Amino acid sequence: MAGWRVIVCGVAVVAATGCASMQSDSVGTTSLYERLGGKAAISAVVDDFIGNVAADSRINRRFAGADIPRLKRMLVDQICQATGGPCTYTGRSMVEAHRGMAVKEAEFDALVDDLVKSLDKFKVGAREKQELLGALGGMKPEIVGQ
């Protein structure tokens, strides 16, 4: 149960953390949160993403017994906050959250694949998708192998 929540949260925070740092590159530009369509659009992507993960035999065993409604709320808040939205994420750091889980690189990559499928399904623009995914590589060491 905890494994599911932590891995998915890890991906969301990884993606969202990078977005927060990238969105301020151009003063006066619309926030990534707004460009993504706000909380409703983020929620739709997260719902689809969770469905992809649940159907993914490479990683779904990590999420058996997870509190899915809570997981979705947490992911939405993480992405919302990190992309410049009005939400607040109060969860643990990626290192804390993944300590002792021994997340494998292949599992991390599978989660990223599932997120990309959702972003593509909702026709997220190339710039926004790049911002969301750009930080994944940098955060990977905080998640994989902990």
What residue spans do the PLM features occupy?
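C-terminal motif of bacterial Sec signal peptides marking the signal peptidase cleavage site
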Residues: 15-18
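N-terminal, post-signal-peptide region of Sec/Tat-exported proteins
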Residues: 51-79
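Post-signal peptide N-terminal segment of mature Sec-exported envelope proteins
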Residues: 25-52, 73
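Extracellular zinc-dependent metalloprotease catalytic-domain scaffold
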Residues: 51, 133-134
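Bacterial N-terminal signal peptides that target proteins for export
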Residues: 1-11
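Bacterial signal peptide processing site
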Residues: 20-23
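A ubiquitous short alpha-helical element
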Residues: 30-36, 62-64, 96-104
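Compact alpha-helical subdomains of small soluble proteins
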Residues: 68-129, 135-142
